[in-house]
């Protein structure tokens, strides 16, 4: 009898038993600590939610509930101040989170907060305390790594690293710079109008939900690279890239809920095709090729593009060619982030704005008459943004569209620095992940009458923009805010002025439906419109 083999077998089983028992003790001990003894245990909320990430995984993944709906239910049941909605049951499985604790906090503060426990606030005061220029907090890696895993300005989680990158890129998206982009934007809008007219001549309704997404995609490619991807040319606006973006959003909850699975899939991405990854790779390669060619031949880069901004062209007086502002790898990641999918939120606002206009004949008429005042002839030049932004009703429509589409809907979580912070009058320890979803501000009856209704008139007169947070606020707010406003003005003004639109109410949903997948993932019927080119416009 092989006693040595038996002993080895028993020792292996014993070690496995000890390991499993140790993990169970840690698991149960952590849950009890988080639910009862943790500094955040004083806040109201279900104890299971405070004790374990699995509570949220169960409701979000297995029951299929939207995170914002879950948070609304929690605040309704436990109060409007703050609600714990996730513990740290799987810390031992997620090495990224362990590394984050080690790098970002002292062990003392990590033990105090037990690292990255999530806390959601619903008040405007809390929003202001979290998202302001003085809050130099990192992004929660758990939330952001599930949507983007790059070293782009958006993907960088460390505040100081992100600030350095934003300071470099921000001048390209300044108001003055965006004013020079109007030619490129109008070029793509003109092509959209041609496509809408073509569909009308074929006897078709136009799917404006897809049309706006294709338009926003082509605008971003034109602005960043000097050449669009041609998504507007796809039949019925059925761009594979747009469908890939939806596939990516559909996988967000899975990637967020199971970080270990996410890390494994990323590590074997060469062998396993992730949702939408094939299309992303194709378009990512196109961007990378533009960067390579631009670095090698900078004088061939089209003017007023982001690539041209990052790769300055040489001048006759320069002794040496100017160096790119970023490494080739970082430049490629930055441009890929902006080009692929960065126009999604503004496209959503276009859909909401046009839907709101067309559902109200009086509003349609009034907006049209306002635009005619500055654009008397349809075949005349499109008024510049400096003129359109002075139109009060058009501006009100855009603000209301932004309010009802929210931008990003998931709480943009920030990790409080060591030492803690005061949020809405409450001390929150360092290491806590805190956030407020834009939806809680935009849909609050404390700030808006009938918040679920499209009422542009609420923005006329002395109404304040304080509670409009679609682009977020603070040092990590949306860099493309000026560009987004410019697109919304030019797109809505052009369509209302140069296209006669019919809205078949029986084929459209009164309200746009979505699920929280970081950005809204829209479902239900798309916005269908019959579009006829206005007389005199060609």
UniProtKB/Swiss-Prot annotation:
Gene3D superfamilies: Cytochrome P450. The keyword Membrane applies. One of its GO terms (cellular component) is membrane. This is Cytochrome P450 monooxygenase flvC. Cytochrome P450 monooxygenase; part of the gene cluster that mediates the biosynthesis of flavunoidine, an alkaloidal terpenoid with a tetracyclic cage-like core connected to dimethylcadaverine via a C-N bond and acylated with 5,5-dimethyl-L-pipecolate. The tetracyclic core is synthesized by the terpene cyclase flvE and the cytochrome P450 monooxygenase flvD. Its cofactor is heme. Pfam families: p450. It comes from Aspergillus flavus (strain ATCC 200026 / FGSC A1120 / IAM 13836 / NRRL 3357 / JCM 12722 / SRRC 167). The chain crosses the membrane at residues 17-37. Pathway: Secondary metabolite biosynthesis; terpenoid biosynthesis.
